[in-house]
Structures are given as structure tokens and as C-alpha cells.
């Protein structure tokens, strides 16, 4: 607890993803006042032609930041 799931277009290497995951872990741990070790991060690549379909999996209420924000 907590878990952050990031989805993005393909094209970034593993090192870039690792750096992003570490920064997210640090920020979330600080904001939620939890130990970094309990924060997990996954990163999933989604092809551009499947992006809209992918976003439809999520309930509107779960978007706290969106393109229209």
C-alpha cells in the first residue's frame, strides 16, 4: 500500500522507467507519510492505437487528473 500504475506509449528504455518509478515512489511516500518500501510502481506500455480503449477500462470517478482538467 499504495500502488501506482503508470501506462504510457512505448518507446522509453528500462532505465528511464526505473528513474520515473523511483521518483514516483519517493513523492508518494513523502505525501502520504509512509515508508518508501511500501510503495510499489508498475509501468505498462500501451500502443497509441489502443490508448482510448485502454482508458475506457477506468471509471470516470478514478481520474483525478485528465486531459480535460
Where is each model-derived feature located?
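A domain-level signal for the structural core that forms small-molecule/cofactor-binding pockets
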Residues: 2-69
Amino acid at each position: 500500500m499504495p500502488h501506482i500504475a503508470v501506462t504510457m506509449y512505448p518507446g522509453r528504455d528500462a532505465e528511464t522507467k526505473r528513474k520515473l518509478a523511483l521518483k514516483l515512489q519517493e513523492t508518494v511516500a513523502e505525501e502520504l507519510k509512509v515508508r518508501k518500501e511500501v510503495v510499489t510502481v508498475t509501468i505498462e506500455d500501451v500502443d497509441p492505437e489502443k490508448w482510448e480503449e485502454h482508458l475506457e477500462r477506468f471509471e470516470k470517478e478514478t481520474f483525478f487528473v485528465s486531459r480535460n482538467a
